[in-house]
């Protein structure tokens, strides 16, 4: 469901979207696509799969000349029903949605929500440290 559902829905909608003057697909992906956590190996494995799907699909859509923008909203630490009572420093669902919509409006391919930009920076500067931080969650 974490990978197959969004990928299959996108596949089914893409032919119709390609016939529009312009269209967007925004795949909301956990920041765990960048580095996994210890407690959820299967869940964490599905996140890079969805991110890879988005990147490959973006290249295919561009090559085909379709007017469809494929975007990724990568988010960490969002306060949802699933995460209530766990972790600190979470942003609200409304703040996450606002950041994604801002990135959509700016046409960004990858939209970093909340602490995701910080995680990217840590992973760029010290991949081992970033993974140790995340795997301990």
Task: Enumerate the predicted regions with their spans.
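Flexible, glycine-rich beta-alpha linker
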Residues: 35, 68-87
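Residue(s) in the substrate-gating loop at a strand-loop-helix junction
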Residues: 30
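Active-site loop immediately N-terminal to the catalytic Tyr-X3-Lys motif
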Residues: 37-42
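A short helix-coil junction within the Rossmann-fold of NAD(P)-dependent oxidoreductases
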Residues: 12-21
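C-terminal helical subdomain
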Residues: 72-73, 84-124
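Active-site helix of classical SDR
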Residues: 10, 46
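Active-site-adjacent segment of SDR/Rossmann-fold oxidoreductases
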Residues: 35, 56-68
């Amino acid at each position: 469901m974490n990978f197959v559902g969004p990928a299959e829905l996108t596949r089914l909608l893409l032919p119709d979207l390609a016939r529009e003057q312009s269209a967007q697909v925004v795949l909301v992906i956990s920041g765990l696509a960048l580095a996994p956590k210890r407690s959820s190996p299967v869940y964490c494995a599905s996140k890079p799969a969805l991110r890879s799907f988005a990147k490959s699909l973006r290249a295919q859509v561009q090559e085909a000349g379709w007017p469809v923008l494929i975007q990724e909203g990568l988010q960490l630490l969002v306060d949802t029903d699933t995460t209530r009572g766990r972790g600190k420093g979470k942003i609200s669902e409304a703040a996450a949605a606002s950041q994604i919509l801002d990135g959509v409006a700016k046409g960004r391919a990858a939209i970093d929500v909340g602490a995701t930009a910080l995680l990217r920076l840590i992973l760029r500067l010290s991949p081992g440290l970033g993974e140790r931080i995340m795997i301990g969650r």
